[in-house]
Amino acid sequence: MLYDKADGKHAIVICPDYDEWGYSLSEDVPPFSIASDGRIDNKDIYDLDGKPIVMPELYEWQKEIEPIVVAFSVGEPYDKDWDDYHQRGLDIAHKLRKILSPDFELWYEAPSEDKSGTISSRTLIE
């Protein structure tokens, strides 16, 4: 089960990482992955009709971060147009917000590898 907030909503954070697109604010929930067809691999995350969510663009966007995560982990230099990456990520987040059940809060956060400051803090997607 996802993190239960005082208002009864579950909090999901979009923050790309290696083989993950986001996480719950609850420590006992594993990070969220996504199948190559764009299906979100978590039965507790559902759309307005209670059905699983499929977003191929979320999968493609998340996969872009993987070479940077690897480079960062071994101390190799990397380059990324963070402004563009985050604009596309926010566009995806807003699209997800439109189809995501109102049982969820949706947040967007920059990955730890991003030192640009483009996204300086976790942002609520409304």
At which residue positions do the language-model features occur?
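Intrinsic low-complexity, intrinsically disordered or marginally ordered coil/linker segments
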Residues: 1-126
